[in-house]
Amino acid sequence: TLSLHDALPIYPGQKRDYDSDYGGFTCCNGTGMENHVKYQAAAYAKTDDTLYVNLYMPTTVTWDEMGVSVKQETNFPSEHSKLTVNGSGDFTMKLRVPYWATAGFEVKVNGETICTNPEVSTYVEIDRAWSDGDVVEITMPYTLHLDKTPDKVDGSTVASLMYGPLVMVAKDDRETYVPMNWYTVVLSENLEDSVEVVTGPDAEDGSVPHLVTNGLHFYPMYDAYNYRYHAYVKVEETQSVVNKDQLQSLVDSAADALQENYGEDKIGRAHV
């Protein structure tokens, strides 16, 4: 039998436990099992002459009308996926470009690059006469972004730190919202400049992704177990974020103006 549980906890400093070692989930026992069937149903779609690849997961789809099958190989949370065509036929393959794949998305067919950096939330279209053994390789580097809630908490913006498709949670015992102030970390408009990627999604030793910023260590939500975590953090936005290159240009201009009046030996040039 399966025991019931209230929900997956996301309050500050919560800890996820399983109902039992082998007979329960962290929450949603019914829909938890249903998820996997839904993934299968949503992974691919087709029309008379087009195959849509919607999800990047280890699967094999058989297209009886076209007389082909496509095997997809990937190792979540890897940034890479490979599709191998079995059989031959003239059809279009459309590959989904995730909304978070904002840099470095690349598609190769039989080792030849056919597309780089397409528009996000669209499909890359490959229309060709496919042969048995054709290989499509997809690379989609994970990018960092904040997923903000519609409302604020005590006047502060609340958000989840996302790494590609992964919700990253901060490992921290505090039971109040932990703050992150990007301005105090680095004068930049890019999260990549203020978040250190300790372990990426393709770690050779199989380690899960690991990010560090503001002294906080972030791990994927799916791996958070038996410790207190924060799925949402307060993002301090009280000061304007300034582009580092723009700020350096302003400092250099001011230093040049001062040197004209006071001389090179009197002025020290600042660096940001």
Enumerate the predicted regions with their spans.
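Surface-exposed beta-strand/loop patches in extracellular or lumenal glycoproteins
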Residues: 84, 89-99
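Mature, Sec-exported extracytoplasmic domains of Gram-positive
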Residues: 95, 239-269
